[in-house]
Amino acid sequence: VGSGWPFGAEYLAPEEQVQMLYPVTVDVKGGRFTIGRDEVLGMANAQVANPRSNPTKELLFIRLMPKHVAHFTEGVSYDEQAGNDTITVDVPEGEHVLYFFVKLNGYSRVILGAPGASGPVVNHLDGKAVERYLDKFSDAMHFTRGKLKGEIRAAFCDSFELEGNNWTPGMFAEFEKRMGYSLYPFLPYVFQRTGAMGEPVREAYGCSFSPEVTRDVIERVRHDFWHVQMQLFKENFIDVYNAWCHRNGLKSRIQAYGHQLHPIETSMYLDIPECESWIHDGIGRVMEPNQYLSGRGYSMVNKFVSSGAFLANRNIVSCEEQTNVGNIFQTTLEEVKVTGDRSNLSGVNHSVLHGFNYSPRQKDFFGWIQFGTYFNENNTWWPYVRPWMDYKARVSALLQNSVYQADIAILPPLEDLWSIHGMQRDPYPGVTYPAYANDLWEAVQQSGNGCDYVSEKVICQSSVAGGRLRFGSRSYKTLLLMEVESLEPRTAARIADFVAAGGRVIAIGKVPHKGLGFRDAAAKDARVKAIIDRVVTTWPDRFVRVDAPQGDMLGWYRTLQAEYGLTPYAKISDLDRFMMMNYYKSGDRDIYFVVNSSIERSMQTRLEFPAEVAAKQAWVWDAETGVRHMLDMRNGTLELCLTPAEAKFIVFEKDRGGQMLPAPAPRSANPIALNGIWDVRATHHVDKSTREFSLTDLVDLHSLPFPWLQSFAGTIEYTRTVDVEDPAAYHTLDAGLTHNGITELFVNGEPAGVRWYGARTFDVAGKLRKGTNVLTIRVTTVLTNYAKARAADTPTAARWEWAQRLNKELGLRGPVILY
């Protein structure tokens, strides 16, 4: 819907445009102070990333505050002068701050909007403005009649970078109605200057507040104000959007995260919740702790979105996948696979590629590219995309018809985060709280368990019985409180009910001891503390506190798992941060999706399955080929080897009719190392020029003294002969390491397979002949070196030059062995 994001357009009336209350501050000392209103308005410039040049500004409130606030004071109001051309204040002796609260109207514009939808952002807290905006589309498109009727599945809405949309007419009345007290006295305590993408600016300004005022006033009122904004957003955008979609025969598909959206609950209201997975540098190679961007692929919001979807019993978890804002031309198809697999591990089962780059023929070679991986017929690896597409389709079909299993619920400290730091711009939060927040669910799934995030609302609406916390179709035996300090009393009471019914609660690092919000704070604090203290005293074995992890998250969780009997769905003998397992059920099938997301290492582990699962027939389903084989599994255990970037479905079902997985053929007693001279032919992808030379050793081709290689992209064919006395003794060719490319084998001129990820091993059984054989290994490189070389004369290549690593390692490195 619309163009660019967030929603907006040139035709919006002023009262429909995005609004912000922005604080201008001036330090003053004793005596008369005078300032012009125009000067104040001139200082009201929110440093947003996508500003409009001519926002409307209106001075609404003026407040004089002491510079150093040790105890709460409302300050002195000079609102009566807000309409004056000149503002005069008699300042008492000492240091003070004048706060001028300016309403900015239409201050931000649509990001990358096309003509007709590139003007000011619509006020997402104004339901009537949102509805008029949406109706303009449906009035023109006629979704419910004509050619489009029944042809459009869903209306899509991107994530919400609203950049500080904190105001709407009637905000004071809405706040008081919902929170039971007035927001007006707390203006200097709550409203902050907003910078890029809605994040608060880090500069010092205004008053300094004592720790007591920060704790007892600012954090509690801030919590309430964010909740009011969250409620208004749901009522005025999410509910309006849903209703508009359904009136027009459409499903709602939204990336429901950002400031003012609950990262779990908002996805529960949607027909198709969506998240996003990115290709960042290091995918498949690094996975640093407490660094949510480090090699993950999935964004930190994915687990929140998928949890909300599962809680709402949605069978589709959509994902904007393969988003790419830097590594455009150096991304390999192998990295695309790893990113997609990781996306699935975060709960995704419906991938929307970002994006196919369609360009007119008159554009340069690289064409139009905007934030997406280079899925384009001009890419070197485009001819090999189909195998990945088939693989992805099989994975998605299986997961969409299965249910992810989780018996551990994680309550993240969202309320504490919002109180202390404010709501965050997910999926790129300014603050991660606690530091390991996005690593905990990973460790759970890397250790064979399954988990969902839950919210306080979910807990309160859950039933408890038989040691389980039940919400809809979801059921949990264990609740992990992730450094949660604050709860609503009703949430604490429901947690107490869960423990009393036999459930287990593990409080990580901290034990809840206070309530939420400003009104009746002392009473709520006492109530929460009393409930939790009683639970700890009454059931010390079922409500336990453990130290927070320090460093080795996986080791910490393995200890927790063993000590508190967190029975995994399958016991994994050798844990690794790059190996993760998800467990699903489909009817009476038990489905394990096991992924090695390391591009560099194979993984060897032993899986031990529960007796009731192991009693069924075990199968391995190969999503790359669609082939299924039965497994000969003994004593409920399976020795599993995953080559780099490999994923397997291990499926248990009652059907025992099928072929057994063939045992690996024994290695030849006399393997042949293909050392010596290789004849090399390099064909440029763009101009089709060829170069030929010979190598005595397989090396990174950039180490050779050939200037043309510095800008090369295309295919490199390595050819040599090998004499084979007994062809039946050899069944595999291992091509070793390929630098950043796709590997293809030809034996005596006949195709013998393509390896676009993982181990470069080829089945050559029956393909060799006695005597001399001609082997050709074709490597298809990425575009990065060519793109770097074209930056001087091609705008698209120049735009992404900053992210391309010049002289990316190139070619076949081997060793090449026939066995």
Indicate residue ranges for each PLM-predicted region:
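Carbohydrate-binding surfaces of carbohydrate-active enzymes
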Residues: 1, 20, 32, 140-154, ...
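Mature N-terminal, pre-catalytic/accessory segment of carbohydrate-active enzymes
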Residues: 1-152, 819
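An acidic-aromatic loop/edge-strand motif
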Residues: 2-63, 67-72, 545-546, 553-563, ...
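Short, hydrophobic/aromatic-enriched beta-strand segments in well-ordered soluble domains
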Residues: 98-103, 649-655, 718-720, 774-781
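Aromatic-lined ligand-binding clefts that engage carbohydrates, nucleic acids, or primary amines
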Residues: 610, 722-748, 755, 775-779
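Exposed aromatic-hydrophobic patches
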Residues: 637-640, 761-766
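Exposed beta-strand face motif in extracellular beta-rich ectodomains
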Residues: 648, 731, 771-773
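Aromatic-rich membrane-interfacial microdomains
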Residues: 751-762
